[in-house]
């Protein structure tokens, strides 16, 4: 999200034009039977609600990253209606939306669990920007198992199965950044030095997802 403020043009090029390029490849293929388009839970117009967003809620987004994902969702919906609409011939195409997925192989910038591990390994303090921001944390195997089920259903149902799907934890399992940090450190049996601070000049980030 923060990188999209620095380079919004590339953000839109990748997430919007990248999506349309994939959709065009599917449209011009004779072999694709089903496809899932992975976007994000940030594609919704975020009103800082305490409850989860539904697949029918308005798309949008405050920051360029979220907005670009909303645009990608609109493209997918347009292609579903315009090109992937023949029940007997069209491939099944659906979007799937998940957020704050954690698991092995995650080396991206500004990721809580990798940053916690690095600070523990380097015996350095970890600075967290939004300790009380809540996120729908889930292990990568949870949404991936759902994605596979959606793909299987699309393969069998074709374009009749076209839709959009949210994947996330039960609302009772949603934790703040602070809670996840403390749970992670406790599981390692480590009293890690964590400092929480906010920056008035920091770009907007949603408190509740």
Predicted regions and their residues:
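N-terminal Rossmann-like NAD(P)+-binding domain of SDR-like oxidoreductases, especially those catalyzing
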Residues: 1-98, 102, 182
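Residue-level signature of the cytosolic catalytic core of signaling kinases
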Residues: 68, 105-109, 173
